[in-house]
Amino acid sequence: MLYIIRHGKTDWNVEHRLQGQTDTELNEEGRRMAREAATEYANIHFDVCYCSPLLRARETAKILLDGRDIPIIYDDRLKEMGFGEFEGLKECFSIPDCPVNVFFKDPANYTDPQGGAESMDSLFSRTGDFLEEIEPELEAGKDILIVGHGAMNSSIICRIKYNLDRKRFWDEGIPNCRLMRLM
């Protein structure tokens, strides 16, 4: 089976800042959320955990799997989508002409990333490569956990559940520290 979870809360989540690949840590609420998730999901079997190398995901994985003999493998392809010069921007949704708003409001039409932001094609390519690589493990019956991020997780969900239909990209966003079984 394949499971996916989003990291715990950070100060930037609370402040509504665009995190992207900026390496922020969990805040105390995020650590509490991860501890609660560890208790809630303690009886779910995982053979291996693949995790974004960004600190907020690493912290979540370590807390979530503390005391369990589950290897954590960090993979750059699981980093959050990059938002370039817009990372750190507060309340970007309230800025009408902010170019990354298209990604959040109408992802099917996010075709011209600006300011060094990552394209959806790039995001889908790297997460697709990752999924192809772990496919033999899934076929062998391994239970795999992915610890990631909002947009990165959505790219995997969109590929598996919606055949890359970009109109459905945000249909099943995962709240912080909530687990979803994908297959």
Where are these regions (language model features)?
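Domain-level recognition of soluble alpha/beta enzyme cores
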Residues: 161-183
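Glycine-rich phosphate-binding loop signature in dinucleotide/nucleotide-binding domains
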Residues: 42-45, 134-142
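Active-site-proximal alpha-helix that buttresses catalytic centers in soluble enzyme cores
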Residues: 5, 9-70
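Active-site signature of alpha/beta-hydrolase-fold catalytic machinery across serine-
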Residues: 63, 155-159
